């Protein structure tokens, strides 16, 4: 089992960020890891079919993003994640180039008569412009603007948001509000642990382990793009968070139903107190209840439910809706 399940620690950290304060049992993390692996395999298979439809054997980032295009908030979060990744990469490259140029420049006054301060200022301004352009350069080919031959000019000062960006910002603000509520009463050590858990990833500095774990070499013919691996790392984090948040809601509902049944049981009355009559095999009163496999299985069933908007199409297909794994 230790060879099959390799991400127990990372899944525990992601579950902690999503609201699970108790340490989940091995069965729970193993089930989540199996679900995540199945989702990764399904993403790769569907992305391969999408790439084949456009006459290519290699998967590009747009093939993966196309599979989640209906979740506007997630797509915008992913685009922001990729743009900041490119921004950091370009900043490192520019720093390396500036360091190499500075090492061979000698003193401040060169043959062109330009001081180091002026040159540094120009380099800084140029780097800022390049990074700003690079950050906003991610475009998706199925967007409305690609249906026209001529594209509108981009205005860097224009800061208008469309409905998709507003939806993504609202979802991001809700997540930040939940994170703020959870971390408000934390000590410094607890917040450091929280920050470390937020950096948990299936792929960051674990690319080889992730490829062996998911079996990418058996699923696709060509070598995957680096951005594809990063996107899969982003989506695996989102999948674990979605499963955990849904499972916590299901656990709360189960506990509410159990408490209602408990209240309907006969009570033992004494002077000044009212308590439920204890049975022979009743457990302790204050027991820690982490997420169990049944909570994860029910959360998986809920998340795999087909939306009514898409289910209505079965009326025109003889009433039978073909079952297919939903990518979370």
UniProtKB/Swiss-Prot annotation:
Residues 93-128 are annotated as: Disordered. GO terms for cellular component: nucleus; SAGA complex. The keyword tRNA processing does not apply. One of its GO terms (biological process) is transcription by RNA polymerase II. It is found in: Nucleus. Signal peptide: none annotated. InterPro entries: Histone-fold, TFIID_TAF13. CDD domains: HFD_SPT3. Disulfide bonds: none annotated. Residues 101-113 have a biased composition (Gly residues). Keywords: Activator, DNA-binding, Nucleus, Transcription, Transcription regulation. The keyword Oxidoreductase does not apply. Its main location: nucleus. It holds the Pfam family TFIID-18kDa. One of its GO terms (molecular function) is DNA binding. SPT factors 3, 7 and 8 are required for the initiation of Ty transcription from the delta promoter. SPT3 regulates Ty1 as well as the mating factor genes. Interacts directly with TATA-binding protein. It is likely to be required for normal TBP function at a subset of RNA polymerase II-dependent promoters. Belongs to the SPT3 family. This is Protein SPT3.
